[in-house]
Amino acid sequence: MITIFWIWGICLSVCCCLWLILGLRRRRMGEPPLEKGWIPYLGCALQFGANPLDFLRANQRKYGHVFTCKLMGKYVHFITNSLSYHKVLCHGKYFDWKKFHFTTSAKAFGHRSIDPRDGNTTENINNTFNKTLQGDALISLTDAMMENLQLTLRRPEPKSRAWVTEGMYSFCYRVMFEAGYLTLFGRELTRQDAQRAFILNSLEDFKQFDKVFPALVAGLPIHIFMTAHNAREKLAEGLKHDNLRTRDHISELIRLRMFLNDTLSTFDAMEKAKTHLAILWASQANTIPATFWSLFHMMRSSEALKAATEEVNKALEDADQQINFEGKPIHLNQTQLNDMPVLDSIIKESLRLSSASLNIRTAKEDFTLHLEDGSYNIRKDDIIALYPQLMHLDPEIYPDPMTFKYDRYLDENRKTKTTFYSKGLKLKYYYMPFGSGATICPGRLFAIQEIKQFLILMLSYFELEFVDSHVKCPPLDQSRAGLGILPPLNDIEFKYKFKHL
């Protein structure tokens, strides 16, 4: 018996050795330098996950602007020269940008693939987004968000001039989640108290689910996180079509998705709901921390606060809008919102400092990638990745890059600045918190408008102060690097009280 175990042990050891010898990838002629790491399958994943920016900078110094890293069994080619970003996008015919995103969505939210090539639906989700997040549809969505933000902030509760102290991130989370949920998925006009309780419960479920999202993207099954799994199922239950049909003022995006799910897909009721949950997550997970950073940096800079207040007051005066809790809600149209370069610059600068997105494309076939730094052979199923935080924090492009400068995106005429340089050359891509090319976030225009609306209302309705007048900027939560806007590692206490009572 012992002999048999020895034989099986030797066979297993030989198989492992053969796998290590034959399965290890070797760099071929014309390919980028290869950093495989020392842990089978994981490769460099632990080092990358601990601090992506430091990891990529170290490899950039070691290998140059283009190098390959093994991450979770995948070979990822990082392009770190911002002057080459537009060259990468010119190779679009060789990329499958949908594969990674559709696979990740199905894995994280628990529905079958929404890629039409997999046969579960014939809906082109990108066309759906383009129809409902631009043009007239964007106008109605933005108007609804302004109304719902004020519904949330101007809640008909006893008001006083007393200061209210709260964590700023918690405040932004609560307000933006509630207003955003109502904007996308509608309201129950006859059950306000029940709706409020439902939203608050959904908020807690969303936090539990979102907490494990980086692990789900990394490939871990949600069933090992029972609390998060239960939270996901409860969120999806509230987004079933039977429940949505009882609500009024559902956004055009969700109405169209409901129709297409019902007519073009083979999804069951729960799977349809989970495709809506994916939209809920996409609309909140980055917007909430982006809102926090915009409010935090605006308040922390006296110059930014003064310039923003003057711009908001002028916009309201020009639009003949009165600030009054008992009067009509504030309304600014799309043109008026777009003509606020100071707020635009504050938001852009806040996102520049907090964005850590990973722009990913999968190679459909073997091809040669031609860049400013040379040409490189890429294998089928390899991943091309851009990490714009390298560019956003490059001192040559953005002098003193770790300092918030509210007017960084304003030119000498106080209009939006669009000209930035690297190595004396004008950059085509200099600001990329929303991705790029075919993978650019379809909801980016709405996201900017809702953050801007939030700032307008906070400046209009409230007096704002930090509890600690010498508050320091909280560190970024690196556990979410690669997913978009990084939240603060700790909350910051602030206080607010109503004006004009």
From Swiss-Prot:
Enzyme class, UniProt record, top EC level: oxidoreductase
Key word Lipid metabolism present: yes
Primary localization: endoplasmic reticulum
PROSITE patterns xrefs: CYTOCHROME_P450 (PS00086)
Membrane topology of the entry: Single-pass membrane protein
Tissue: Detected in liver.
Intracellular or extracellular location(s): Endoplasmic reticulum membrane; Microsome membrane
Listed transmembrane segments: 4-24
Keyword Signal attributed: no
Pathway: Lipid metabolism; bile acid biosynthesis; Steroid metabolism; cholesterol degradation
GO biological process per UniProt: bile acid biosynthetic process; cellular response to cholesterol; cellular response to glucose stimulus; cholesterol catabolic process; cholesterol homeostasis; regulation of bile acid biosynthetic process
Matching InterPro entries: Cholesterol_7a_monooxygenase, CYP450_sterol_14alpha_dmase, Cyt_P450, Cyt_P450_CS, Cyt_P450_CYP7A1-type, Cyt_P450_E_grp-IV, Cyt_P450_sf
Reaction it catalyzes: cholesterol + reduced [NADPH--hemoprotein reductase] + O2 = 7alpha-hydroxycholesterol + oxidized [NADPH--hemoprotein reductase] + H2O + H(+); 4beta-hydroxycholesterol + reduced [NADPH--hemoprotein reductase] + O2 = 4beta,7alpha-dihydroxycholesterol + oxidized [NADPH--hemoprotein reductase] + H2O + H(+); lathosterol + reduced [NADPH--hemoprotein reductase] + O2 = 7alpha,8alpha-epoxy-5alpha-cholestan-3beta-ol + oxidized [NADPH--hemoprotein reductase] + H2O + H(+); lathosterol + reduced [NADPH--hemoprotein reductase] + O2 = 5alpha-cholestan-7-oxo-3beta-ol + oxidized [NADPH--hemoprotein reductase] + H2O + H(+)
Record-listed E.C. numbers: 1.14.14.26, 1.14.14.23
Keywords: Cholesterol metabolism, Endoplasmic reticulum, Heme, Iron, Lipid metabolism, Membrane, Metal-binding, Microsome, Monooxygenase, Oxidoreductase, Steroid metabolism, Sterol metabolism, Transmembrane, Transmembrane helix
Binding residues for heme: 441
MF terms (GO), sorted A to Z: 24S-hydroxycholesterol 7-alpha-hydroxylase activity; cholesterol 7-alpha-monooxygenase activity; heme binding; iron ion binding
Domain of life: Eukaryota
Cofactor entry: heme
GO CC terms, sorted: endoplasmic reticulum membrane; intracellular membrane-bounded organelle
Biological role stated in the UniProt entry: A cytochrome P450 monooxygenase involved in the metabolism of endogenous cholesterol and its oxygenated derivatives (oxysterols). Mechanistically, uses molecular oxygen inserting one oxygen atom into a substrate, and reducing the second into a water molecule, with two electrons provided by NADPH via cytochrome P450 reductase (CPR; NADPH-ferrihemoprotein reductase). Functions as a critical regulatory enzyme of bile acid biosynthesis and cholesterol homeostasis.
Family membership: Belongs to the cytochrome P450 family.
Protein name stated in the entry: Cytochrome P450 7A1
